[in-house]
């Protein structure tokens, strides 16, 4: 069994981005990511701090806009509009979840696609579905693909199962795997017999937010397992969606939690931001 070490790979990517940023600075461009946080959700605050720290580590300027819980939808839209027209800002990220009175889809669509470094804008989704690399790809699925590539895992002809059908992970992940030549099944909360799909899979990607959802009796020998889940137990321990101790015994490759997909997600956010800054140079 080989651990897919996202932490080590993300550190390598950050070093490469440092060099790219030094080159851009020599051309008068400083990569810049604007992060908007609405409200005081503790988890969201932690995520925003980690993103700002990661930016600093590889020479990306970060602007954090922390708005109060009562910020109106129009006020948020006005801020995004200002950032859309600011040539010194290359990426705009709105930290989710948003308060109930703000329409998430409207907000995400208001970010200009050329600065949508999360890859959620309909234009970028369209590029992905057409198999084009013109836009930005969603960070978590992109991170998974980079991790698989780094370990020289050939996806062509593989039977892949994705558990979870969100627009953030499951759906774009399915498209990327299809584009790479895999045969893809997407399972979700209404799938009748999950094991029916997972037992025949060469590759399983779990992104459901459910502790121990994937157990060893549900997988075949030699399976490749990617655990996107992040769950905090009452003890404070962070675990994924996979019964790691048991499933790892049957796996050829598996990601740990933490230290697998999480660091790659942030690395891809940074990579997309630098890509946007480079686009400005071109």
Swiss-Prot record:
- Matching CDD domains, A to Z? NAD_bind_m-THF_DH_Cyclohyd (cd01080)
Q: Which GO terms describe its cellular component?
A: cytosol
Q: What is any one GO biological process for this UniProt entry?
A: tetrahydrofolate interconversion
Signal peptide bounds: none
**Protein function:** Catalyzes the oxidation of 5,10-methylenetetrahydrofolate to 5,10-methenyltetrahydrofolate and then the hydrolysis of 5,10-methenyltetrahydrofolate to 10-formyltetrahydrofolate.
- Quaternary state and partners of this protein? Homodimer.
PANTHER family assigned to the protein according to its UniProt record, in alphabetical order = C-1-TETRAHYDROFOLATE SYNTHASE, CYTOPLASMIC, C-1-TETRAHYDROFOLATE SYNTHASE, CYTOPLASMIC-RELATED
Protein's UniProt name: Bifunctional protein FolD
């Amino acid at each position: 069994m080989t651990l897919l070490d996202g932490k080590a790979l993300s550190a390598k990517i950050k070093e490469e981005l440092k060099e790219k940023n030094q080159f851009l600075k020599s051309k008068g461009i400083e990569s810049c990511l604007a992060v908007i946080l609405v409200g005081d959700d503790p988890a969201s605050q932690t995520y925003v701090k980690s993103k700002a720290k990661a930016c600093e580590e590889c020479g990306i300027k970060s602007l954090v806009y922390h708005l109060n819980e009562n910020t109106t939808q129009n006020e948020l839209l006005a801020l995004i509009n200002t950032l859309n027209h600011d040539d010194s800002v290359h990426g705009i990220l709105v930290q989710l979840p948003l308060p109930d009175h703000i329409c998430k889809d409207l907000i995400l669509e208001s970010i200009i696609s050329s600065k949508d470094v999360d890859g959620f804008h309909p234009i970028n989704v369209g590029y992905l579905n057409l198999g084009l690399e013109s836009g930005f790809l969603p960070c978590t699925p992109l991170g998974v693909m980079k991790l698989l590539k780094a370990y020289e895992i050939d996806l062509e002809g593989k039977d892949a199962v994705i558990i979870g059908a969100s627009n953030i992970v499951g759906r774009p992940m399915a498209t990327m795997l299809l584009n790479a030549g895999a045969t893809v099944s997407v399972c979700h909360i209404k799938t009748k017999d999950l094991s029916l799909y997972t037992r025949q899979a060469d590759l399983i990607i779990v992104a459901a937010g459910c502790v121990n959802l994937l157990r060893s009796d549900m997988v075949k020998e030699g399976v490749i397992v990617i655990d996107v889940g992040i769950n905090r137990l009452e003890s404070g321990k962070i675990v994924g969606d996979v019964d790691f101790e048991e499933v790892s015994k049957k796996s050829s490759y598996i990601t740990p939690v933490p230290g697998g997909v999480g660091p790659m997600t942030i690395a891809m956010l940074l990579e997309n931001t630098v890509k946007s800054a480079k686009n400005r140079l071109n």
